[in-house]
Amino acid sequence: MTTSAVEVVIGVIPSAKTKTGMFSTAAYTLVVTNYRLIFARMTNDLVKQNTERVRAEAKAGGAGFFGQWGAQLKAAFAFAQRYLAMEPAAILAESPGNGFVDPSQVRQLKVERKWRSAGSDDDNSQAYLRIIIETTAGKTTYDTDGETPNANDAKLLFSRTFGALVR
């Protein structure tokens, strides 16, 4: 008698954006399971609901204006973290734009640490991740808002599912 392992979420990469046109992008949370990579679309409605929920929780906890504002700033990270407690099937069903790739479809998955200008006079730079996924259908590039997790941790996370395909 054989039993197959249950699919579980093993990690997330928040706020990964990919170009969808000349001036437009789509934001996703990259959800890594023990079997595949799920692309969970961050729709405006989902982000708005999450922000309202986080602010309401802060207000119910006695937070004033600045406490609610601080909670709202942390909402994007909290948005991604909620996927850690969800079933993969529920994540896929959450939004019409959600999808996945499994290791048999991936030729290479590359994680790079990049820098972007913060746009100020003192030229502070911000680190971010560039994740390039080359599949049998083509290549897609995702840039994160920051470096959470860092590049090495992201590579380790992806390698748990994609093994030697991760560079």
Each predicted region: which residue ranges?
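Acidic, Ser/Thr- and proline-rich intrinsically disordered linker/docking segments
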Residues: 3-8, 18-27, 35-167
